[in-house]
Amino acid sequence: MSDNEKFNDALWREKLTPEQYRICREKGTERPFTGEYWQEFRPGRYHCRCCGELLFDADTKFDAGCGWPSFYTPATKTAVREQLDTSHGMYRTEVLCRRCDCHLGHVFTDGPEPTGLRYCINSASIVLDSEQVSFTPSTL
């Protein structure tokens, strides 16, 4: 059973703010230039807001000018999973937490070297490692 299946909708709503729930569980998107981390460049690691899984290292974060936190690679090859997103009449690659299926954002092929990728991530879906997460891995 995946971690996502262990929690029902009521528990996710209890543990997340309404905005976090809309983005993480309903695949929403925060408005550009409004998220907590779009201009954050402290060292550290970014974890999944829902389950605490390590997702991105701050040293791979860059200013893409798009208004969302952007990274050129995940922390590990297995941190995230990708799937086709055809919502809103577009073809995009959605990025989700591999552990709990939290919607993180999208990945695009207009990023910097060394990968050429831009993981465009909602601030509401992540937390910097020095901050509290809604669920810690031990509670899943």
From Swiss-Prot:
Q: What is this protein called?
A: Peptide methionine sulfoxide reductase MsrB
Gene designation per UniProt = msrB
Q: Which UniProt keywords apply?
A: Metal-binding, Oxidoreductase, Zinc
Q: How is the cofactor bound?
A: Binds 1 zinc ion per subunit. The zinc ion is important for the structural integrity of the protein.
**Cofactors named for this entry:** Zn(2+)
Enzyme active site: 120
Can you name the source organism? Cellvibrio japonicus (strain Ueda107)
* InterPro entries attached to this UniProt entry: Met_Sox_Rdtase_MsrB, Met_Sox_Rdtase_MsrB_dom, Mss4-like_sf
Residues annotated for Zn(2+) binding in this entry: 48, 51, 97, 100
